[in-house]
Amino acid sequence: MHHEVMSGLHVNSLRKHEILRKEQLIAALFVSGKSCKGEYLKLFYQKTVSDVKSRSPAVQVLFAVSKKNVPHAVSRNRLKRLMREAYRNEKQQLFTLCDEGRPEMSGIHLQIAVLYIGGRKSFPSFELLRQEISRLMHNIRLSELT
């Protein structure tokens, strides 16, 4: 149950092992990954294929808010919290892309970086972030399935 793609118990949770932390994967994501951009967020993503059944989860994500864009730590932390919650509510879209139940998709892993690129004056509401993450994840699904 530790690294299952979608166990019924944790469908809408963001587990610790789903957070992208490996420096090598993060560096590769920014160097060779694709990106899509919205009004407030920019997503970098990269699909990797492993021939051996890996213990890492199908989708790993990281969230970042630049100190340059949002100088106050309290605001940065709030934005990251909102981004994590919006992703958590919409992440089920991505698991259809990396569904381990389909043999042609087994061994597929997706790394995603969600960056806040909005302004520092006014911050988007949770609902706006949720809609934008949903739209950007839909774009990822379309580009990766073709």
UniProtKB/Swiss-Prot annotation:
PROSITE patterns, sorted: RIBONUCLEASE_P
EC identifiers of the protein: 3.1.26.5
Transmembrane segments: none
Catalytic activities: Endonucleolytic cleavage of RNA, removing 5'-extranucleotides from tRNA precursor
An example molecular function term from Gene Ontology annotations: ribonuclease P activity
SUPFAM superfamilies listed in its UniProt record: Ribosomal protein S5 domain 2-like
GO terms, biological process: tRNA 5'-leader removal
Keywords associated with the record: Endonuclease, Hydrolase, Nuclease, RNA-binding, tRNA processing
Recorded superkingdom: Bacteria
Paired cysteines (S-S): none
Subunit note: Consists of a catalytic RNA component (M1 or rnpB) and a protein subunit.
The family this protein is said to belong to: Belongs to the RnpA family.
Listed name of the protein: Ribonuclease P protein component
Lineage: Bacteria, Pseudomonadati, Chlorobiota, Chlorobiia, Chlorobiales
Gene this protein is translated from: rnpA
